[in-house]
Structure formats: C-alpha cells, structure tokens
Amino acid sequence: MSSIDPATFAAQFAQIEIQPFKQRYQLQTNTYQSQLSALGKVESAMREFRTALNEMNSSTNSIIKNSTSISQEGYFTANADAKALSGSYQIFVEQVATSHQVSTGMPADLDATTEIPKTGNLEFTINGKTMTIDLSTVDTDGDGVTTVSDLTKAINNNSDNPGVNATLVRSNGQTHFMLSSTETGVANQINVSATGTGQAWFEDAFTNLSQISAPQDAVIWLGAEKTGLKLTNSSNTFEGVIDGVDITVTKAQTSGETAIGLGIGADDEATKEQLNKFVDAYNTLISTIDEHTQIGSEDKKRGVLASDPTMRSIESQLSSLVRGEHGGMRLSEIGVTLDRHGKLKVDQEKFAEAQKNNSAGLEAMFNGDGALLDSMDAMAEPFLKFSSGAFKSRKEALQANLDRLSDKQTTLERKYDMSYKRYLKQFTQMNTLMTQMNQTMSMFG
C-alpha cells in the first residue's frame, strides 16, 4: 500500500469546496468591471459630444456661418455672425479711437529713485470713476523712502484703478513719468490732481501735464462721408451697427475719399463644415453607445450594457430631440434625418436649399436658448454632473458591487485556508496509518 502526499490531496479537496463560489465571484467581477469600463467610455464620449455642442453654440460660434468681403483692405475689418443678413454697404472711416496719454511735469533729473512726498493724496478720475492714492501708504517695502518707482506700482496695482497706467519712460537721456488711459475714447480722459503734500513741485507736476496723445472716439459713416449715417464709438469696435455685424476700424481715411464697400453673405462651405461637425459628434456618441449596448447575434457579442436603463434613457432622449421641433422647424425639413441605425445623415442638396431660402430659420433652430444644441446640452447635463450625475451614481453602484465581491473573495480565501488545514491534518493522519499498516504487513511478508 503506497503512501500519499497529504499537502497535494489537501489542496485539491479544499479547492473543490470553494471552486463553484470562486468561479461565480470571478464571473460577476468580470461583468461589473466590464460594465464600469464601458460606462466610463460612454461618459467620455458624451462629454466630448457636449464640448462639441458648446463650441458650436456660443456668442462667437454657431452652425450657420456668414462671411464678409471688403473692397479695400487696411481701414477696417468686419465679422458677421449667423444673424447677419446678406447685403452690401458703404463704410467711410473718419477717425479711429485713441487713448489719452500725458507726461507729468516732473523735474528734469527725475529717475526711478527720486523721492516723493510721504503725505497727501493723488486723485485720478476717469469716466466717472475715482481712485485716491494715499501717499503715506506708497512705501510698501518699509524702507522709509517713498520713490517714483513706488508710486507707479501703487497706481497700477490699486484695486480701485479706474483705467490708468503709470510708467517711467527714458528718452534722450531723461526719465519721464507717463500716464496712459487703458481704454480709448473721449470719455476716458485722464484727470489727476495732487493735494496736501506740502511740496509744490510735486503738485505742480500733476497740474502741468504735457499731452502726448489726445483721447478721441472712433467715427465712421454708414454711407458716404458727410451724407451717410454718422456713428461714434469710444472703442474702435462698433458692435451690431449692422444687425449681426461687428466692425473694427484700424486706420482713418482721408477726407474726400470714396467710402469702402462691405459685403455680407452666407458662407456655404463653412456652414456645411459646421453641420458635419455636429453630425459627426452625434454619430460618434451613438456609435459608442451602440458598441456597448448591442443585443448580440451569431457574429456579435452581446454588449455589457445591453439592458442598462441609463443607456436607454440617453438614446431615447437624443432621438426625441432630433425628431422634435426647434424654432418652428424640424431637422427632417432641412435634409437631416436618422437612418435605421439611429445615426444622422444629411441630404446636402436639401440642406443647401434651406440655407439659401431660410438661413435665419436655420439659426433659430440650431442656436440660442432653447434651440436644438442648447436642448441637447441641457439633456446631457444631469447625466454628467460630477457630484450627482447619473454616470457617477451608476459607477458608484458598480464599484460597491465590486467591493462586496472583493470581501466575499477574501472570505473565500479564509475558508480555503481552513479547509486546507483540516484536510492536511486528516490526510497526514491517514498517511501515518498507512505507513504503520505497511510496516505491520512487512512483518508477515
């Protein structure tokens, strides 16, 4: 009668006891991990889709694109948004807006270390806003000396600064204390006075200002000079002078010159590109969802999220929005429809016709509050909230399941250890008994 290996037998018998549970727990773990991974991929795809929506639905960007053409470059630029209507205009640039720049009447031997009074106030008023510099607070480094350099920092860094920059400029061997308004236009003229310092040279310096650049507004004529509509603006950018069009002037024309032509029209290619971006973003999201929710067939594996209610809700809401009415129109009316796979396809000829005949209607359908892109963004938000979104809740639930399975597997390992020790003891005893029997039998051999 041959002996046995107690350790091998103990391991085999202990493994048999836990094997059904081990296989079940591992299968469940694999399922939950696959679902967790799939949810992460869908969530990522949905965030990318939402980013694309926001990029096409902002104050500076939309689905519908218009373009501008200018007959003579160098005097102004123009930007037309989706609301702009096609048309031709004449623009004459009389003057550009400039900011106010002055040089103070500081002494000729001024430099950055020149000391200034430690008492009194320096007051600035620009466009109705006032800033008062208390000269006793200008010495921020605490060295007991207040310098012109300290004053420039105090002016520029003051939280109440109404729009003025102070700089020290060196020219022809002399340092000048300069003040410049940060905004253009007559309204942004710099008014400054120094009082209570007890030092006339300092107060006179802010009374005797040398003007380097006068503040002026931008002036254009919508039409010919002197006979068209005169428009004045403190900034060089005239926003919405023509509905949906911003004009930025860069150089003044000479009086008597001919007005410059401005043309506004639909940018068919840019609009087509934007529409295709929207369609591609939508279809990419649907493809990602479909990859993980497919029912399964002979040649396709069932998706790990095939019965997931969150996925069904997303697809249902997206489909409803695509088929719904927005701004009095439906996507199907302009050649954008769903195919049998739930993805968007575009009839380019039908869309081009809609763009030609009703660009304003297209803009109202796609962009703006409550329009299609805004509605899709609002639909996605509850799913993607970092604190309480549906994806977060689903992933937390799956992770909780994985944690419970991990605890069960730990318990199973303890059970294996206990069974192994029990079987090892039993098989060791059996092996000892078999050895004794063999020895007894050999005595009669």
Swiss-Prot record:
The keyword Secreted applies. Its main location: secreted. GO terms for cellular component: bacterial-type flagellum filament cap; bacterial-type flagellum hook; extracellular region. Residues 388-423 form a coiled coil. GO terms for biological process: bacterial-type flagellum-dependent cell motility; cell adhesion. Pfam families: Flagellin_IN, FliD_C, FliD_N. Homopentamer. V.parahaemolyticus possesses two flagellar systems: a single polar flagellum propels the bacterium in liquid (swimming), while multiple lateral (peritrichous) flagella move the bacterium over surfaces (swarming). The polar flagellum is synthesized constitutively but lateral flagella are produced only under conditions in which the polar flagellum is not functional. Belongs to the FliD family. Required for the morphogenesis and for the elongation of the flagellar filament by facilitating polymerization of the flagellin monomers at the tip of growing filament. Forms a capping structure, which prevents flagellin subunits (transported through the central channel of the flagellum) from leaking out without polymerization at the distal end. Essential for swarming motility. This is Lateral flagellar hook-associated protein 2. It comes from Vibrio parahaemolyticus serotype O3:K6 (strain RIMD 2210633).
